[in-house]
Amino acid sequence: MEPISINIEDKKCFFYQDENANKCIIQPVDEHELGMLDAEIKEIKRLTNDNSFLLVAVLIDDWNKELSPWKAPAVFGKEGFGCGAADTLCFIRDFLIPYIRSSYRNVSEYYLGGYSLAGLFSLWAGYQTDIFRGIAAVSPSVWFEGWDQYILANTIMAKKTYLSLGDKESKTKNKIMSTVGERIRMQYECLRNDHILEWNVGNHFAQPDIRTAKGFSWL
């Protein structure tokens, strides 16, 4: 499927559209993930037997800054995490969704999701606003410093939440990232909406497109 590329508020967005779309999936991606979206969309259609959705990929230029809810030290390499998630959510809520509403009048439901840090961002956004009916947090970076305290003190607003993790993701020498298994179970226990935790085979880098498709399909 050939996407339509549109710049909205200087943010590049890719629209994978169906003329009869009545629901919209919004997914923050990097350049590498753009190349996997065709396979992801194909898998969503296969799993759901449903073509009536619009997928909008939002290209993220600075992954560690634009998707992080607050500042945190680096866990690998030297690059730490910024606090740009609020700006990214503001763009989606105040500019992207109004554009979609005006251009695709049949769309009435919005879903947000992503992989890795984009999965954490999607979870965090679900705590900030009720505009998203469902959240797909696929192999989310729930090891993020302070996330455990945050979910204990807050309640998610989305009606449905999909969580998944690879069964080998916690098997790492990195002490912070090795907590991801414990943290994803904690996240699951803290949710009070319709939710599921699915375990995938493999490490963090195994089939992100297929895993993400499974998440959106469950929603």
Pin down the residues of each PLM region.
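The conserved beta1-alpha1 loop
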Residues: 26-30, 139, 165
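Gly/Ala-rich beta-loop-alpha elbow adjacent to hydrolase catalytic centers
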Residues: 113-118, 122
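The feature captures the conserved acid-bearing segment of alpha/beta-hydrolase catalytic domains
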Residues: 142-219
